[in-house]
């Protein structure tokens, strides 16, 4: 091995080692967080914050089926007790007043800071007279015993009014002391995990703990609980299921694709050495691309990795071109000197391969401009992988090939393929009609071609979605995504903004436009409001004087309310309420779901809206009513679809820009608009026919179909460029034609298995690229010029 050869191989090994080290240290994930935008608008920012850190992403809906109602209730109680003691869970509710004591103690201790009724008028003699009279009247009711002990310290009923105001409007029915479904056949629990929605590892660990805890409690109850089973749903369940499905699918299709490609290469080469050498560009491309994405983005998405492993089908093309095109042209031709043949290939064919590679890179470079990291990842992976594979083919493989190694004679196959090409040329008119019919179909169905629903990309099966909907309805967990959001630089700022919105929202409730609303300021009033409420509390002398007047005509003496006077004086000088004071109460959980701090230090207050009975919320009228308040009205479901629609529009625009970039590069390289049109026409025809075929099969196109179309153009550009080269050199040679067909089969073998993945996004890619690449070759051959002098 001469110095030049040694330097090239050593440099490649060193770079591959570095890339492998970076790839092994890369963080891999299968959640969809990288498919959230870098710079969302106001509504999308609320959605993104909720998906990443909001309470909605941490909810687990739990049901216990089987056994008897009593056993289910016992299991529910024991499971809730066990889970509350574990660090994985922030809250566990099952209908028992497990936090009733903490909630009551907190509300009682801070009742005058929490109550919206705390103002100077509330402590006038007239107001006190009415309040005390109402409290005395309630002593005859079912809660009279409890109220009797509370009356001396809280004669105005501030504590119970506050607790009543924060009580959820509807809760599941109780059976044997715990929540149960309406038919009583299922015990229900609502569990909140501590881990954020994007920490799927922690969410999965919490689910394992939950299921293990249930199994232990069921075993502890013995035979009576043997028939009990656990049902769990919620975002964490969907996220962990999706990750598992994607990971298994990526592994499955990668192995199948690799096996098909290896089988194809063995069929072509009939040489283990050539097979191993031919895989080097592929493996280098995958390793270098994975390392580049890991370094550039900090995390490698499972979807990107699945896409990348399928890219083996295109990356293997380069070695096929080298090995086949540098082989003997026919039985009469003596086996060429191996090194001379490879140098001749570099001189004759590398410019065409290089132009095809650059064309592919230009197309995918447009995706880097997307502010959606997932789309940019796919673009970066494709660019780096194709570039690395091509460079290894150009510089490394010729140095590694043994001097006497040559590919078997493929001239017979090439000659048969030549006859096929001539037959395809005779079918130009029918193929043109096929393209026109496909274009007409797409034009006629233009309003139904694209599926702009985010759910279309979900791998979650319908039975899981149905089970979630059933649990959600049984437990009364609202699936309404309507809320009002205000953002600010501090917690105090957003709490004040939430308080300012309350009068407008109460007006909407009175008008019947909404059924109600919640607010973080209900559980933690702003400091400004708390100080105002403290300032409204009277001193002892004044309060005692008002009480003496207030009790006139009532069957009670003013002296009985000395605890009331003492507590009011204590509240006047007590420290203001903070988030830390709410710990160990259900108020903390409610507050944390509505008061969010983002990763940049900003704050958001969310005010969930409840729909009026029997009708949805008219969000347009709500927006009109809140105009000028600085608040935004968000429909999370609609916003998620709008986010995907924006994603899709961005991808379409960038793809068109990529095609224009390809055309510009080809024009610069070929210096002929006619030749550029001849190169691009078969690729665009293939895309049109594939898209129409998918629509005819009842599919609506999604984001990954679009990325697949880009891949069809990228892979097909090599075919079209070789046919263009053949026209300028008297026709395409049989071995070149054979190399194109085998390269095409490699692409089909790489992407075809994606159809079997069971993951919509991967299946969409396979359904586009596999037939699209085949059609790109067919159209390139059909539109190639007739031979006019024989190949050279």
Which residue ranges define each predicted feature?
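Transmembrane alpha-helices and their membrane-interface boundaries in multi-pass membrane transporters
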Residues: 295, 311-327, 350, 354-412, ...
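Alpha-helical transmembrane helix bundles of large polytopic membrane transport and channel proteins
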Residues: 20-21, 34, 74-187, 202, ...
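Extracytoplasmic
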Residues: 144-267, 271, 570-663
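Juxtamembrane segments of multi-pass membrane proteins
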Residues: 428-551
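Solvent-exposed, non-transmembrane loop/terminal regulatory segments of multi-pass membrane proteins
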Residues: 22-67, 166-178, 423, 427, ...
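Hydrophobic transmembrane alpha-helices and their membrane-interface caps
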Residues: 274-321, 675-722, 752
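Signature of alpha-helical transmembrane segments and their immediate interfacial
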Residues: 1-30, 398-399, 403-453
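Pore- and gate-forming transmembrane helices of large, multi-pass membrane proteins
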Residues: 279, 331-370, 729-757
């Amino acid at each position: 091995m001469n110095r030049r050869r040694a330097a090239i191989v050593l440099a490649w090994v060193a770079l591959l080692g570095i890339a492998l080290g970076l790839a092994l240290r890369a963080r891999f994930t299968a959640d969809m967080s990288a498919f959230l935008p870098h710079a969302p608008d106001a509504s999308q920012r609320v959605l993104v914050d909720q998906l990443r850190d909001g309470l909605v992403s941490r909810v687990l809906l739990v049901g216990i089926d089987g056994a008897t109602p009593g056993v289910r209730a016992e299991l529910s109680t024991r499971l809730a007790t066990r889970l509350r003691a574990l660090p994985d869970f922030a809250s566990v509710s099952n209908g028992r007043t497990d936090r009733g004591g903490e909630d009551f103690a907190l509300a009682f201790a801070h009742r005058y800071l929490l109550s919206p009724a705390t103002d100077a008028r509330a402590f006038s003699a007239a107001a006190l007279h009415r309040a005390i009279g109402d409290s005395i009247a309630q002593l005859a009711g079912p809660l009279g015993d409890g109220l009797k002990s509370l009356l001396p310290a809280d004669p105005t009923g501030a504590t119970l009014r506050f607790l009543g105001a924060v009580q959820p409007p509807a809760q599941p029915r109780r059976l044997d002391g715990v929540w149960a479904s309406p038919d009583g056949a299922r015990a229900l629990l609502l569990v909140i995990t501590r881990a954020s929605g994007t920490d799927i590892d922690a969410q999965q660990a919490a689910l394992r703990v939950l299921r293990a805890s249930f199994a232990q409690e069921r075993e502890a109850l013995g035979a009576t609980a043997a028939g009990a089973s656990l049902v769990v749903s919620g975002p964490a369940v969907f996220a962990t299921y999706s990750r598992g499905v994607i990971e298994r699918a990526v592994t499955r299709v990668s192995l199948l694709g690799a096996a098909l490609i290896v089988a194809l290469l063995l069929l072509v080469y009939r040489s283990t050495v050539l097979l191993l050498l031919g895989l080097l560009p592929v493996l280098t491309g995958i390793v270098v691309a994975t390392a580049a994405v890991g370094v550039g983005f900090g995390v490698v998405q499972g979807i990107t990795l699945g896409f990348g492993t399928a890219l083996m089908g295109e990356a293997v093309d380069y070695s096929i071109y080298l090995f086949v095109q540098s082989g003997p042209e026919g039985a009469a031709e003596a086996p060429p000197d191996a090194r001379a043949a490879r140098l001749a290939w570099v001189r004759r064919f590398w410019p065409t391969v290089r132009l095809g590679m650059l064309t592919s890179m230009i197309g995918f470079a447009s995706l880097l401009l997307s502010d959606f990291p997932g789309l940019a990842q796919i673009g970066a992976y494709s660019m780096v992988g194709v570039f690395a594979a091509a460079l290894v083919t150009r510089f490394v493989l010729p140095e590694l090939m043994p001097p006497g190694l040559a590919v078997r004679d493929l001239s017979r196959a090439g000659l048969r393929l030549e006859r096929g090409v001539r037959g395809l040329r005779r079918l130009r008119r029918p193929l043109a009609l096929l393209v026109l019919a496909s274009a007409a179909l797409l034009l006629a169905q233009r309003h139904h071609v694209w599926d702009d629903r985010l759910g279309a990309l979900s791998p979650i099966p319908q039975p899981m979605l149905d089970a979630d909907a059933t649990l959600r309805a049984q437990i009364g967990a609202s699936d309404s995504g309507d809320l009002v959001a205000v953002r600010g630089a501090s917690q105090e700022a957003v709490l004040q903004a939430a308080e300012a919105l309350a009068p407008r929202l109460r007006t909407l409730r009175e008008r019947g436009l909404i059924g109600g609303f919640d607010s973080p300021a209900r559980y933690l009033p702003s400091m400004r409001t708390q100080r105002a409420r403290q300032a409204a509390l009277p001193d002892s002398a004044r309060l005692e004087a008002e009480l003496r007047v207030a009790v006139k005509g009532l069957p009670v003496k003013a002296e009985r309310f000395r605890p009331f006077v003492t507590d009011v004086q204590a509240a006047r000088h007590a420290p203001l309420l903070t988030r830390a004071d709410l710990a160990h109460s259900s108020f903390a959980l409610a507050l944390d779901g509505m008061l969010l701090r983002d990763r940049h230090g900003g704050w958001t207050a969310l005010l969930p809206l409840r729909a009026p009975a029997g009708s949805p919320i008219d969000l347009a009228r709500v927006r009109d009513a809140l105009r000028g308040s600085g608040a935004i009205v968000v429909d999370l479901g609609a916003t998620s679809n709008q986010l995907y629609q924006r994603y899709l529009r961005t991808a379409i625009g960038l793809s068109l820009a990529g095609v224009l970039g390809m055309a510009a590069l080809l024009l610069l390289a070929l210096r002929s608009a006619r030749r550029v049109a001849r190169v691009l026409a078969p690729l665009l025809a293939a895309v049109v026919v594939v898209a129409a075929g998918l629509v005819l099969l009842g599919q609506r196109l999604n984001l990954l179909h679009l990325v697949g179309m880009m891949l069809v153009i990228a892979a097909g550009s090599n075919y079209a460029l070789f046919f263009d080269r053949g026209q300028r050199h008297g026709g395409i040679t049989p071995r070149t034609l054979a190399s194109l067909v085998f390269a095409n089969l490699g692409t089909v073998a790489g992407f075809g298995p994606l159809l079997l993945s069971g993951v919509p996004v991967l299946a969409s890619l396979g359904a586009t690229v596999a037939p699209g690449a085949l059609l790109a070759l067919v159209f390139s051959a059909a539109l190639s010029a007739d031979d006019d002098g024989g190949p050279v």
